[in-house]
């Protein structure tokens, strides 16, 4: 996800909004930005404010939600970012998702690209958080089991009737950037469209181990070069 975002802002075609919709949020670490609050935390704050009656007088719940939403929007030089985070108390994400959906509706026209990093369950896309998905990237490691897991996600996307403009598979961390015959056979077995293959990259691995943002690696990095070619081939 971080590398894709890096490629988009590097092209300078317009502003990018990043939505980290994975409950185990860490995309900000890949991008090298600090997260002070998440929409999950805001949900808890709003619930407590409503319970204790501390929503400012003269301010509706919707106004308060919009104000708090602004607190969660991270504005970086290269992109803006929202983190869904996790809810700590009981209850569901329904209201937070509603806030996210309504606020995104207001913010979307300001961005050329919106990139959402999802959990495998695709809950936020299924709930209509985004009005339409132009490109769905399915990411798997270079293993048969990884491809099988992605194939199940592809089935879910079809069952949900999401109909993205284009959808395809990117294989990550392939030794020497090459597919094993067994993995290729598994891809063909499930009828998955292969967008491309990314090589195992020692520099990316070191960034992960050392806690450094891999998106800041030089443009000559092998994984960045490979991803740039894939994105050009699919019109991004």
Where do the model's predicted regions map?
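Conserved catalytic-core segment of NTP-binding enzymes
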Residues: 95-197, 206
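Residues in the short beta-alpha loop(s) of Rossmann-like NAD(P)-binding domains
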Residues: 21-24, 173-175, 201
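Conserved beta-strand scaffold positions in the cores of enzyme catalytic domains, especially
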Residues: 18, 79-81, 194-197
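C-terminal boundary of histidine-terminating zinc-finger modules
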Residues: 210-221
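Glycine-rich phosphate-binding P-loop
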Residues: 1-2
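C-terminal alpha-helix
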Residues: 226-236
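N-terminal phosphate/diphosphate-binding loop that engages ATP/GTP or pyrophosphate donors
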Residues: 6-77
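Cytosolic-facing regulatory segments adjacent to core modules
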Residues: 60-76, 80-116
């Amino acid at each position: 996800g971080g590398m894709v975002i890096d490629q988009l802002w590097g092209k300078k075609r317009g502003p990018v909004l990043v939505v980290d919709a994975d409950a185990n949020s860490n995309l900000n670490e890949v991008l090298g930005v600090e997260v002070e609050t998440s929409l999950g935390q805001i949900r808890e704050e709003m619930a407590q404010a409503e319970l204790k009656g501390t929503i400012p007088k003269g301010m509706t719940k919707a106004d308060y939600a919009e104000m708090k939403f602004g607190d969660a929007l991270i504005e970086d030089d290269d992109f803006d970012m929202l983190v869904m985070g996790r809810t700590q108390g009981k209850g569901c994400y329904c209201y937070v998702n509603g806030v996210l959906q309504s606020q995104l509706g207001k913010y979307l026209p300001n961005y050329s690209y919106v990139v959402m990093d999802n959990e495998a369950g695709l809950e936020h896309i299924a709930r209509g958080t985004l009005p339409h998905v132009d490109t769905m990237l399915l990411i798997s490691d270079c293993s048969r089991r990884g491809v099988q897991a992605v194939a199940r996600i592809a089935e879910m996307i079809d069952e949900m009737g999401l109909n993205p403009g284009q959808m395809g598979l990117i294989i990550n961390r392939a030794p020497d950037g090459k597919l094993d015959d067994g993995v290729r056979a598994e891809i063909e077995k499930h009828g998955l469209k292969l967008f491309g293959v990314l090589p195992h990259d020692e520099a990316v691995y070191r960034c992960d181990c050392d806690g450094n943002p891999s998106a800041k690696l030089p443009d000559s990095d092998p994984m960045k070069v490979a991803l740039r070619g894939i994105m050009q081939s699919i019109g991004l």
